[in-house]
């Protein structure tokens, strides 16, 4: 056997030591290169086709089969980003991106994300990074106050907020908490009797969460909505469904109401729905993923009336609040319900701070153990722009949507299909624009072709939905770089493609585009 003396006497070369991949000056140099690259990208982002034009499998065909054995320079890597990666990106930050919902970025959000990534802490409990936990406590309370949430949702009122990754995670956590709370009362064997309620406009995240939580698919109630009610969840239909389930020996568990549905941004009637839900002891979650951010503006706060009777509430700051993905804000009235369902306390995580019960361990408020320092970027956004400018940011997009809605109304070939509440307009080519094409299936097909034609052009990007059997084009405004000129240009693109699509066989001679 060798001795310690023999080991220390061995001559070691520098190659036997780990390489230094975080040398401060080299980090500074490469960091400047990266900032310059991104700044140049944003300067010319409008010049790229909004939606990627590549075909499936394009990247595997142009990248090597194996990872490089020797190091490559950042300059070389960035060159490949420019020539190989950017062509395969759909540019969500383009001012001509009007699809889905916005993923609004900002300098403050990016820099906060950079700092969080640079610190690279893993804040699963208070002890491992007190600032990460406590800043999250602070910013969720700040945001909650901006929304005028009831004090019972704030840490100062016995509730509290947590930053999840996405709405899917937030809904899953609250559904699991509701499930376990109910089963502790009714017995674990009754999981097959639990029923979840929503509307047919509710985000699919709830259905996925219900599957994961073990809810019988037969007990998932997506209650039908109607055009006459603007696709809102009807309280009477909800109560009828609950009573039917009770009569059949089932256990009503959970209601998800929505403020700003994905398809049309309609708002469910929270006061009436929560009244019904509380009558039958359901957990109520309010999903305001998109439209919740608008409710920091006094003129939109009315849409949260009734939230005081909910058990949980969430919104995505990474949609319409200048904060980078991912950042879903979840507030709960009773944190102990989450903790009872999600807590783990193995020996290797035990510590004096946690045992005092005076700190928050966010690992017990989420599915994962490890977690990112998300609070930094939200803190940067709140401080860099302030409540006043954030409100004006929201109002600017709403104003542009009103303008676009007016443009649609002036062209007699088109119609707005659902009321515009926030910054998204749902519209279509209407049947009267086509001679002999009054069948809805044919009208839907024309609108589908219009969407495909516009998106294939790369000039703008829009998405679709189906409302009451009607194929609808969704025009969602929310990009940080978007201004009124982009909205006007987008409408011109839509009109031009409609002109090409509606040839003389379908377009009445008497219809003249009054805007041309």
From Swiss-Prot:
Its cofactor is pyridoxal 5'-phosphate. Homodimer. GO terms for biological process: amino acid metabolic process; carboxylic acid metabolic process. The keyword Lyase applies. It comes from Petroselinum crispum (Parsley). Gene3D superfamilies: Aspartate Aminotransferase, domain 1, dopa decarboxylase, N-terminal domain, Type I PLP-dependent aspartate aminotransferase-like (Major domain). It catalyses: L-tyrosine + H(+) = tyramine + CO2. This is Tyrosine decarboxylase 3. The modification N6-(pyridoxal phosphate)lysine is found at residue 319. Its EC number is 4.1.1.25. GO terms for cellular component: cytoplasm. InterPro entries: Aromatic_deC (IPR010977), PyrdxlP-dep_de-COase (IPR002129), PyrdxlP-dep_Trfase (IPR015424), PyrdxlP-dep_Trfase_major (IPR015421), PyrdxlP-dep_Trfase_small (IPR015422), Pyridoxal-P_BS (IPR021115). The keyword Lyase applies. Belongs to the group II decarboxylase family. Keywords: Decarboxylase, Lyase, Pyridoxal phosphate. GO terms for molecular function: pyridoxal phosphate binding; tyrosine decarboxylase activity. It is an enzyme of class 4 (lyase). PANTHER family: GROUP II PYRIDOXAL-5-PHOSPHATE DECARBOXYLASE (PTHR11999), TYROSINE DECARBOXYLASE (PTHR11999:SF96).
């Amino acid at each position: 056997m060798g001795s310690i003396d023999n080991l220390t006497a061995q001559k070691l070369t520098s190659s036997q030591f780990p390489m230094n991949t975080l040398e401060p000056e080299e980090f500074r140099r490469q960091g400047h290169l990266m900032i310059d690259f991104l700044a140049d990208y944003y300067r010319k982002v409008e010049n790229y086709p909004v939606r990627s034009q590549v075909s499936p499998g394009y990247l595997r065909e142009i990248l090597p089969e194996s990872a490089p054995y020797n190091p490559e320079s950042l300059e070389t890597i960035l060159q490949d980003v420019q020539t190989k990666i950017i062509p395969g990106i759909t540019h969500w930050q383009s001012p001509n991106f009007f699809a889905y919902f916005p993923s609004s970025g900002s300098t403050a959000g990016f820099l906060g994300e950079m700092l969080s990534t640079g610190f690279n802490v893993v804040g699963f409990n208070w002890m491992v990074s007190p600032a990460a936990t406590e800043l999250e406590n602070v910013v969720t309370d700040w945001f909650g106050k901006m929304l005028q949430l009831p004090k019972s949702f704030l840490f100062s009122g016995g509730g509290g907020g947590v930053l999840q990754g996405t709405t899917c995670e937030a809904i899953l956590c609250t559904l699991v908490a509701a499930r376990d709370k109910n089963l502790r009362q009714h017995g674990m064997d009754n999981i097959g009797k639990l029923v979840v309620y929503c509307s047919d406009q509710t985000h699919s995240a709830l259905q996925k969460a219900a599957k994961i939580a073990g809810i019988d698919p037969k007990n998932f109630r997506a209650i039908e909505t109607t055009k006459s009610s603007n696709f809102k969840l009807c309280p009477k239909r909800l109560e009828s469904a609950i009573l039917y389930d009770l009569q059949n020996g089932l256990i009503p568990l959970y209601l998800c109401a929505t403020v700003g549905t994905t398809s049309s941004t309609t708002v469910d009637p929270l006061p009436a729905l929560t009244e019904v839900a509380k009558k039958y002891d359901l957990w109520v979650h309010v999903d305001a993923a998109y439209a919740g951010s608008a409710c920091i503006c006094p003129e939109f706060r009315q849409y949260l009336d009734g939230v005081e009777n909910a058990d949980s509430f969430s919104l995505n700051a990474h949609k319409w609040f200048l904060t980078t993905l991912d950042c879903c804000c979840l507030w709960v009235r009773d944190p102990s319900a989450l903790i009872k369902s999600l807590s783990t306390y193995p020996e290797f995580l035990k510590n004096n701070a946690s045992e005092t019960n005076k700190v928050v361990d966010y690992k017990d408020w989420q599915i994962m153990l490890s977690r990112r320092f998300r609070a930094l970027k939200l803190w940067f956004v709140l401080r860099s722009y302030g409540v006043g400018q954030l409100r004006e940011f929201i109002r600017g997009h709403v104003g542009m949507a009103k303008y676009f809605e007016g443009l649609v109304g002036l062209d007699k070939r088109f119609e707005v299909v659902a009321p515009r509440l926030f910054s998204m307009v749902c519209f279509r080519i209407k049947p009267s624009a086509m001679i002999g094409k009054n069948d809805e299936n044919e009208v839907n097909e024309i609108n589908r072709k219009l969407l495909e034609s516009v998106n294939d052009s790369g000039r703008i990007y829009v998405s679709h939905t189906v409302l009451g059997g009607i194929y609808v084009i969704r025009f969602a405004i929310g990009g940080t770089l978007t201004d009124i000129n982009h909205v006007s240009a987008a409408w011109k693109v839509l009109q031009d493609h409609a002109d090409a699509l509606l040839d003389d066989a379908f377009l009445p001679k008497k219809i003249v585009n009054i805007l041309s």
